Amino acid sequence: MKIRSLLAAASLVGFAGAALAATDAISAKDQKVANKSVTAALVAASKAGYLVVHEADATGTKAGKILGNASVKAGENKDVTVALTSDVEAGSKLILMLHEESDGDTKFDDKDKPVMTDGKVVMQAITVQ
């Protein structure tokens, strides 16, 4: 009986993990740029891809120049750090955006398109402190 209960509990945990992995999301807070990098506390990806940091307009809604990227695996990725190619000033807005690995070359390039959920790009705007 104990074994059957353990197996049932394990299958429920596995199911919950699979459900989380199927949800694409980014969680990041406003932060100081330390060592020319920014960190997302959590990136959930249904497929392997990239967390890409873009410059943003003053409202934090329109993505601009790409400042850096980091690979993410399918599933839950904690404390994903992206090295930036340019300095950013306090008060600047950045957009952290999830991109899929579209062409199978495992290198981020312009073929790796943003991930969309319900017709919206999966992204999180932050302000540099």
Mark where each language-model region is.
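Sec/Tat signal peptide C-region and signal peptidase I cleavage site
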Residues: 15-22
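Exposed aromatic-hydrophobic patches
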Residues: 39-41, 76-87
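Short acidic/polar inter-strand loop motif in beta-rich domains
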Residues: 100-113
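Short, aromatic- and glycine-rich surface loops/edge beta-strands on solvent-exposed regions
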Residues: 92-101
